């Protein structure tokens, strides 16, 4: 745990303790008696404040569970991905007057492109595969053929 996070946790615990101190004093103290009333010693009776202690215990357990879940979630999200596979991506550029250029790169999803090699004739592709390298046919001819 980092030093600032540890300081934050201890600060939160001390703040909760300071806020709960008046509640503890209220439960454990005797109520003052007035002159006209009969004074009852509350230490002799069973206190009816047991539900406050159970409620306080439940809140403490819930806070600890939430903290543990958040910590586990952070650790799970920050772990390195071992199952990420490297892929190869190829990009071809074809121009009217230029020959076909190929670029191959090894790509990892988490890191990005690792290795780039650019060679002009890396992938020899026959020219008839692409057809004539002229201007595209007009729209009317495409509509007639379909």
Swiss-Prot record:
Main location, first listed in the record: membrane
Tissues with expression: Expressed in some signet-ring cell carcinoma, especially those showing high invasion and metastatic activity (at protein level).
Top-level division of the source organism's lineage: Eukaryota
Leader sequence segment: 1-29
Transmembrane feature ranges: 52-72
Topological relation to the membrane, as annotated: Single-pass type I membrane protein
Location in or out of the cell: Membrane
Annotated keywords: Membrane, Signal, Transmembrane, Transmembrane helix
An annotated GO cellular component: membrane
Assembly with partners or alone: Interacts with WWOX.
PANTHER family: TRANSMEMBRANE PROTEIN 207
Name listed for the protein in its UniProt record: Transmembrane protein 207
Organism (species): Homo sapiens (Human)
